[in-house]
Amino acid sequence: MAVSAALVLLGLLSLSGLDAIQRIPEVQVYSRHPPEDGKPNYLNCYVYGFHPPQIEIDLLKNGEKIKSEQSDLSFSKDWSFYLLSHAEFTPNSKDQYSCRVNHVTLTQPKIVKWDRDL
């Protein structure tokens, strides 16, 4: 009985230690198709390599939040997490699009601009 209790306690302690590992999110912003002004497309924000899993991701048009959808939270072999946030958009040369990520590892939100030339 004591051995079982010790094993359970050891397992719980090792799981709680996962929260102590913090990893800063990496961010990539790209369009699904090559951009053409006035042609509908999808803007993607891929956020990966972060831990713990609690994170806020917003897609922005000229600094204002736009309606977006998000994939289910997934994790890699190293227990870091990744998500894809995406939104329909129609690019033009006047508007600026970006992705804003807020995570416990960041002192301020990380904002990555979409570069239409990539």
Swiss-Prot record:
Subcellular location: Secreted
GO cellular component, one term: MHC class I protein complex
Keyword Secreted: yes
Gene Ontology terms describing biological process: antigen processing and presentation of peptide antigen via MHC class I; immune response
InterPro entries, A to Z: B2Microglobulin, Ig-like_dom, Ig-like_dom_sf, Ig-like_fold, Ig/MHC_CS, Ig_C1-set, MHC/Immunoglobulin
Disulfide bonds: 45-99
Keyword annotations from UniProtKB, A to Z: Disulfide bond, Immunity, Immunoglobulin domain, MHC I, Secreted, Signal
Residues spanning the signal sequence: 1-20
Pfam annotation, one family: C1-set
Domain Ig-like C1-type intervals: 25-112
Family per record: Belongs to the beta-2-microglobulin family.
Quaternary data: Heterodimer of an alpha chain and a beta chain. Beta-2-microglobulin is the beta-chain of major histocompatibility complex class I molecules.
Function: Component of the class I major histocompatibility complex (MHC). Involved in the presentation of peptide antigens to the immune system.
Protein name, entry field: Beta-2-microglobulin
